[in-house]
Amino acid sequence: MPGNNNEIEKRLWDAADELRANSKLKSSEYSVPVLGLIFLRYADHKFGVAEQEIQAERAARKGRRRQRPITVADYHVRGVLYLPDEARFGHLVRLAEGQNIGKAINRAMKAIEEHNPDLKDVLPKTYNRLGNATLISLLKTFHLIEMDVEGDVFGKIYEYFLGKFAMSEGRRGGQFFTPTSIVKLIVEIIEPYHGKLLDPASGSGGMFVQSARFVQRHQQNPSDEISIYGQERVAETVRLCKMNLAVHGLAGDVRQANTYYEDLHRSVGKFDFVMANPPFNVNRIDKDRIKDDPRFPFGLPRADNGNYVWIQVFYSALNEKGRAGFVMANSGSDARGSELEIRKKLIQSGAADVMVAVGSNFFYTVTLPCTLWFLDKGKARLHSSPQALLLIGVPRQDTVLFIDARHIYRQVDRAHREFTPAQIEYLANVARLYRGLEIETTQGSSELMEEHFPDGVYRDVAGLCKVVTRDNIEAQGWSLNPGRYVGVAERAEEDYDFVERLTELHEELEVLNSEAHELEEQISGNTTKLLEAMG
């Protein structure tokens, strides 16, 4: 199949999606089996390469001494999954059309799990539901991937299919997939060069994959530099994540758990990096179960909303130099009542580092905008650093960088937006300048950097970025909303977007509704106590 990787991904998707349409299957019924076949094709490719290498090495030693038989361990020591004959992709493709193909693929998946214990209960085994004609066509389609492809083509195909399935599955898709450009921006700002990574809402593992690519791009081996840990509530999504790691040549300790109540990795103070896209505005969390949990050093919110539970999970998992980057509902930046008190303590700790406002239509499930939060516990250690004192005369640990990226995007289609590689690099460079670090320009951000930062040093840019002191944040009611600080660029009036403004007002209404609900609970509680006292 000639052509670049993007062409390969699109052609494979078009072929697979056409088969889905003809099969009358729902996307949710089709996605996991198809992703499983991509995984199998990857495993077969790696096994075939390792098999040739092992045989070549044995041929070179032939005659020197008696050689033992080749074993499963010979493949595992090379980091390759062992595939018995019945699990080879070519064997499945060559099966006669009269045979039960679904049953044969199920057997292949079971055999792989038996020979590779790390994959126990991970691989899909529901291929008998798809029908012979569909499976034969899928096998032939994926068999077209060339065996001598360069780079991470299988991982990119898997990731491409994940995104497409997430888009087609709507709300369910958004539960397991974060748009890649959002993930890349988080990774570029926290810069996970080396250390232990945690995603306590790991979904299909996109944060891990992009972190590994970041390490590779800086000429290092991810397996040597980063250790991967995750938790995910939905069992099927855990399996997607483990397959995703495998097709990218990564290993990780990802477990099924409800992060509100379970901390299987004993995370407090343990991790160098935390990344996540948690579910927003979750209610009915049983706070009695977690009231003594050390993961919540600033106390539990009284409001029936899980946002500040998640924020503290991320904060508490960081070690003394750790950084976190995560997606959060806009309402979290201005929430009042007990959530304000938690936010105040977080800001006073000095860990709040960078806040990035992202526009609407970046996600597949909701059109609302969001905010990216970045924490850095290492900021408190900057007193002796040459970069510690900013141009405004205040140590960096007493400031927060606010970036308004709501008007920075590429329109993918009518309903979806994304960041381009140059835009991601540009936004990350603003954070790098704020931290006194060297910028990167390999992705095409040079022109944007020259326009706004011609001297190569940080400065506030109206409508884009502003460094704000803790005192000024306190004066604004401890708000972490970039829109309150960054101001408006001169051309903003011409670019006025009614939908964008309506969305912002909707977010403000959410905050007010949350506050009203919290006050209602307080009044109800106080009334109950008063009646008990009078009785």
Task: Describe the predicted segments one by one.
Residues M1-Y193, D253-S267, A357-N361, G378, ...:
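Non-catalytic, mostly N-terminal accessory regions of nucleic-acid modification and defense proteins
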Residues S27-Y30, V34-I38, V238, K242, ...:
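Conserved Class I SAM-dependent methyltransferase catalytic core
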Residues Y30, F271, D293-R295, N305-G306, ...:
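Active-site lining segments that contact anionic ligands and/or coordinate catalytic metals
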Residues R172-A276, N281-I285, I290-P297, Y308, ...:
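Conserved S-adenosyl-L-methionine
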Residues V209, R239, A276-P278, Y308-Q312, ...:
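Feature representing long, continuous alpha-helical segments
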Residues I285-N305, N330-S338, G359-T365, R414-A422, ...:
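Short, contiguous acidic/charged loop-to-helix segments that flank catalytic cores in large enzymes
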Residues L382, L389-L391:
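Leucine-biased recognition of intrinsically disordered, low-complexity hydrophobic segments
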